[in-house]
Amino acid sequence: MSFFRCIGRSALFMLDPEHAHRLAIVGLKSGLNGCQKVVDKRLSVTIAGLKFKNFIGLAAGFDKNAEVVDEIFRLGFGFTEIGTVTPKPQIGNPKPRLFRLKEDEAIINRMGFNNDGHQVVDDRLRICKKAGVVGVNIGANKDTVDKIDDYTVGIAHFYDVADYFTVNISSPNTPGLRDLQARDSLHLLLNAISKARKEQEKKHGFSIPIFLKIAPDLSEKELDDIAEEIKLSDFDGLIVSNTTLSRQGLNNSHFSNEEGGLSGRPLFERSTIVLAKMRQKLGKEIAIIGVGGVKDAQTALEKVKAGADLIQLYSGMVYEGPNLVITILKEILQMMQQDGVDNIKDYRDHNLEHWAKFPL
């Protein structure tokens, strides 16, 4: 058992979750975790025209305001995603809004896109060294009537500083946001964003990849609709998935009835099933980033085997500590050596049929 699990986690878990998160940000700024790297070309992946040093990224939500972009790469991540960022700053939902379900190694949040807004985050990004790929996760303000417009504004604002965009329409904590996943609304959204990208591409002379982040709480028909719209659009891929509203499989936790999106270990199965189904529906060429319940080398590799090109994690680091990524990468390399695998991408789709067969 790691030092973090023995000592550090107990100390941090005595604090309110938001206070602990703030302390983690401050600690990273102070360089308390040193610098850790696992550099091996067998872990590198190229998708959507971007080369990732390794296949593990930090999911949006940890570094909402681009405060520790450079520091994140010292933890071993191959890429990071800041945000979700909205055009105007907003404070989010009332506190308490973040809850640890320790028995389940899970988190429930109803943060509500609390962030510093486009301009402040943009200013911070422009002074980063960017030791790896940095994505910008964009969203809509709670009080915005035309939410699609907020996304096109985000594309324009960050176009010359982002390595890729994530269009987040799947958070359960902004009223009406998930409605944009419905086919008619999604069609309008994807067209508007594609138009915004083309305008910026003409202006700047290069194209930035765009991913759509979807919820796990979707029916087979809804997944079919999303897949068809993605194939009709010029989007580069999907991120599967955001947090879930389901509480299936939880222990009788004190906080299990709190409203908000659930992440962590209980999300792994559902998100991996949705991932595999979307890989089947989209085919081999469209990129997919798998996220949800990754906590060790086994769960990380299973995402790839279910169809992911890259993976992201966040909640796993809360429970396993800042050395998690390094540990996963080292163990994955050992697995590759044992299996005679030349590159992590060679594992992709190995268990696709297994995961895709499960009902939603």
Swiss-Prot record:
Task: Tell me which InterPro entries the record gives.
Answer: Aldolase_TIM (IPR013785), DHO_dehydrogenase (IPR050074), Dihydroorotate_DH_2 (IPR005719), Dihydroorotate_DH_cat (IPR005720), Dihydroorotate_DH_CS (IPR001295)
Q: Which residues bind substrate?
A: 64, 109-113, 168, 173, 242-243
Q: Which gene encodes it?
A: pyrD
Give the record's GO biological process terms.
'de novo' pyrimidine nucleobase biosynthetic process; 'de novo' UMP biosynthetic process
Asked whether the UniProt record includes Membrane among its keywords, one would answer yes
Q: Topology with regard to the membrane?
A: Peripheral membrane protein
Query: What does it do?
Result: Catalyzes the conversion of dihydroorotate to orotate with quinone as electron acceptor.
The family annotation for this protein states: Belongs to the dihydroorotate dehydrogenase family. Type 2 subfamily.
Q: What is this protein called?
A: Dihydroorotate dehydrogenase (quinone)
- Which sites are catalytic? 171 (nucleophile)
Question: PANTHER family, alphabetically?
Answer: DIHYDROOROTATE DEHYDROGENASE (QUINONE), MITOCHONDRIAL, DIHYDROOROTATE DEHYDROGENASE (QUINONE), MITOCHONDRIAL-RELATED
Q: NCBIfam families given for it? A: PRK05286.1-2, PRK05286.2-5, pyrD_sub2
The record's note on quaternary structure and interaction partners says:
Monomer.
* Cofactor dependence: FMN
According to UniProt, this protein's pathway is: Pyrimidine metabolism; UMP biosynthesis via de novo pathway; orotate from (S)-dihydroorotate (quinone route): step 1/1
Q: Which GO terms describe its cellular component?
A: cytoplasm; plasma membrane
Q: Name one Pfam family in it.
A: DHO_dh
State the CDD domains in the record: DHOD_2_like
Subcellular localization(s) per the UniProt record: Cell membrane
Provide a Gene Ontology MF annotation, just one: dihydroorotate dehydrogenase (quinone) activity
**Annotated cofactor note:** Binds 1 FMN per subunit.
Residues engaged in binding FMN? 60-64, 84, 137, 168, 213, 241, 264, 293, 314-315
Q: What is its EC number?
A: 1.3.5.2
Can you state which reaction this protein catalyses? Answer: (S)-dihydroorotate + a quinone = orotate + a quinol
- What are the record keywords, sorted? Cell membrane, Flavoprotein, FMN, Membrane, Oxidoreductase, Pyrimidine biosynthesis
